[in-house]
């Protein structure tokens, strides 16, 4: 979520970006919150290690049609969903949002120009989260791009195996890919 007042929230995509974000935070003049999961850090996307710029996302792949924006350790899931969507024949961009706050409004405005659907993936409660912030921004700009937020509803989640729990709340590749295809088909029918 983004509700920490004047604290700037960042979430690294993998262990290399975690080290880069810690270095960035040391020199940053304002309070910074760095969210990372317990357990192992994602080992993928190592070749994508662009410099961290304040409030700016990292564009991993840029096309048109569908844009997937993941934040933090949802990088592995975001990458697998992106690959599955591409293999199904869709044009799709993949974006590492990096910052939950501040939102990279310049990039989102740019994505709205050539994407009909923006999908946000976060392992946070949707209410007050990153995806909700994207929805609000797109609505304020008057853009016609649709936004699908994928995350956790504001319900109690039992303690347990992380992969099982993610599947239960819809944070798995199969569920997300099916939702994206359904949403995109509805857009094309309009």
Which residue stretches match the model-derived regions?
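Short, small-residue-biased leader/transition segments that mark boundaries at the very start
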Residues: 1-8
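Active-site core segments that coordinate phosphate-bearing ligands/cofactors
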Residues: 9, 23, 46-48
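Conserved glycine-bearing catalytic or ligand-binding loops at nucleotide- and phosphate-handling centers
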Residues: 11-26
């Amino acid at each position: 979520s983004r509700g920490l007042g004047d604290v700037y929230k960042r979430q690294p995509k993998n262990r290399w970006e975690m080290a880069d974000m810690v270095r960035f935070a040391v020199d940053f003049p304002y309070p910074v919150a760095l969210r990372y999961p317990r357990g192992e850090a994602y080992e993928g996307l190592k070749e994508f290690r662009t410099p961290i710029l304040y409030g700016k996302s990292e564009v991993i792949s840029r096309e048109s049609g569908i844009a997937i924006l993941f934040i933090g350790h949802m990088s592995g899931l975001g990458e697998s969903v992106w690959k599955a969507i591409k293999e199904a024949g869709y044009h799709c961009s993949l974006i590492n949002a990096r910052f939950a706050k501040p939102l990279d409004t310049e990039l989102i405005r740019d994505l709205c120009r050539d994407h009909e659907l923006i999908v946000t993936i976060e392992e946070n409660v949707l209410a007050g989260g990153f995806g909700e912030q994207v929805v609000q921004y797109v609505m304020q700009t008057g853009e016609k791009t649709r936004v699908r937020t994928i995350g956790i509803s504001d319900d109690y989640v039992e303690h347990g195996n992380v992969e099982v729990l993610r599947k239960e709340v819809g944070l798995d590749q199969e569920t997300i890919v099916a939702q994206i295809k359904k949403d995109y088909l509805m857009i094309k029918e309009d």
